[in-house]
A protein has these predicted regions:
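Glycine-rich flexible loops
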Residues: 1-218
Length: 218
């Protein structure tokens, strides 16, 4: 199982044991935070969701959580894969590691390719936040499915045609709950995600406050 379903790309994997890499501790730190929030993990069918990645800004290679790791409370380097090459047109990816790279690897690649200053990407699932942000922040088309070359091209399109580089967050209209935040590191990507969640909580409190008591139910 992948983190959000089946891996849809062709994957050429070189099976090697990955050693601890730069950014690994930070990846685990913010993954734990996301686990506590319930925005990554496994659903009631045992299928995992959500993924994180980090890269060295000097290279196009990046490390990403492996497919099927949503159930794990803590990761080891072996639970990640190193993406070393990809081709959107061929729906192809090459990675290194003992696990297959996340099904959303091409989406992460599209973000990195579009903005050289980005060194971390978080793809999480938060249906409440997704609903609040849908078409209010840069949004990929509803007909575009996750983990496909079309999604990678759609993400590149957001960078070309919207202010996503300023907002540092976008949602996937065709992938219910799918929210992606990015930044110079995982701390800044997580901060952007947290800011949007807090904004939504504030809007929800205001809606409740402005709803007449007789219309609140209960």
């Amino acid at each position: 199982m992948s983190e959000t379903g089946s891996v849809k790309f062709t994957c050429d994997r070189v099976v090697v044991e990955l050693s601890r890499f730069a950014g690994f501790d930070e990846l685990n730190e913010f993954r734990r935070k996301l686990l506590r929030l319930g925005t990554i993990g496994i659903d009631t069918n045992g299928v995992g969701f959500g993924n994180l990645s980090v890269r060295n800004g000097a290279t196009s290679h990046f490390y990403i959580t492996g497919s099927g790791t949503g159930k794990l409370p803590e990761l080891m380097p072996a639970d990640c894969a190193r993406v070393v090459a990809y081709d959107f047109a061929r729906n192809w990816l090459q990675c290194e590691g003992v696990t297959v790279a996340s099904s959303e690897s091409l989406t992460h690649a599209a973000v990195y390719e579009s903005d050289p200053s980005t060194c971390a990407v978080i793809h999480c699932h938060d249906i409440k936040l997704w609903t609040a942000l849908l078409h209010k922040v840069p949004t990929t088309p509803e007909k575009v499915e996750y983990g496909t070359p079309e999604m990678a091209y759609a993400v590149r399109g957001l960078f070309d045609n919207t202010d996503v580089l300023k907002k540092k967050i976008f949602v996937m209209a065709g992938h219910a709950g799918g929210v992606v935040a990015f930044g110079r590191d995982l701390r800044s990507a997580f901060a952007q995600l947290t800011k949007e969640r807090m904004n939504e909580e504030g809007r929800e409190e205001l809606r409740i406050k402005n709803t007449p008591r007789w219309d609140r139910g209960g």
